[in-house]
């Protein structure tokens, strides 16, 4: 058990028989009445975000999340195969479970699989990934000074806005939290 006064961003807790990750929290001490902790939590099973308020000092169970380094192998229909890099065990995860992360995952990429009591909750991605441009309009000479952008399709099917000087075949660094172009690799 852990006190809500000890909340930290990223902490995983068990509340109402579900697994939640603390996104934001704030200790509130009103002039009148008891102190409380206002928090914003993400459900690790469904991905939903919910605001919850706890009385100061209230206890919740800490969820012991396991992170395993795994390598993405291939997709077979809607199932996606991953291999543990230490034991070489393979697991399959359904596409609907990791739909948002699939836009950033390519074959042979190492990711962290998040699980709780042998139940797979999702995939943790690195902050940035390198992806190759498969389709974009050619840059027109003189456009580089205007500072505009154009759409580019990447090898995973993700479409991002990139500067005019980016061409097909370029390798780009993409931020996985917002899906935006960072730089050329």
UniProtKB/Swiss-Prot annotation:
Keywords: Cytoplasm, Elongation factor, Protein biosynthesis. InterPro entries: Elong-fact-P_C, NA-bd_OB-fold, Rib_uL2_dom2, Transl_elong_fac_P/YeiP, Transl_elong_KOW-like, Transl_elong_P/YeiP_cen, Transl_elong_P/YeiP_CS, Transl_elongation_fac_P. GO terms for cellular component: cytoplasm. Signal peptide: none annotated. It is found in: Cytoplasm. Pfam families: EFP (PF01132), EFP_N (PF08207), Elong-fact-P_C (PF09285). Pathway: Protein biosynthesis; polypeptide chain elongation. GO terms for biological process: peptide biosynthetic process. GO terms for molecular function: translation elongation factor activity. It comes from the Bacteria. Gene3D superfamilies: 2.30.30.30, Nucleic acid-binding proteins. Belongs to the elongation factor P family. Involved in peptide bond synthesis. Stimulates efficient translation and peptide-bond synthesis on native or reconstituted 70S ribosomes in vitro. Probably functions indirectly by altering the affinity of the ribosome for aminoacyl-tRNA, thus increasing their reactivity as acceptors for peptidyl transferase. HAMAP family: EF_P. NCBIfam families: efp, PRK00529.1. This is Elongation factor P.
């Amino acid at each position: 058990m852990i006190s809500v006064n000890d909340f930290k961003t990223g902490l995983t807790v068990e509340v109402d028989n579900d697994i939640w990750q603390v996104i934001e929290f704030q200790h509130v001490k009103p002039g009148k009445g008891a102190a409380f902790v206002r928090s914003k939590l993400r459900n690790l099973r469904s991905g939903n975000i919910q605001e919850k308020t706890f009385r100061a000092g209230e206890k919740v169970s800490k969820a012991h999340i396991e992170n395993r380094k795994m390598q993405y192998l291939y997709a077979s229909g809607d199932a996606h195969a991953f291999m543990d890099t230490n034991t070489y065990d393979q697991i399959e995860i359904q596409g609907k479970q990791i739909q948002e992360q699939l836009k950033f995952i390519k074959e042979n990429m190492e990711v962290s699989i998040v699980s709780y009591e042998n139940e797979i909750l999702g995939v943790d991605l690195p902050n940035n990934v390198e992806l190759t441009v498969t389709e974009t309009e050619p840059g027109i000479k003189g456009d580089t000074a205007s500072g505009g952008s154009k759409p580019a399709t990447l090898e995973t099917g993700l479409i991002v806005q990139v500067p005019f000087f980016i061409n097909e075949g370029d390798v780009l660094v993409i931020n996985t939290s917002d899906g935006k172009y960072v730089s050329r690799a």
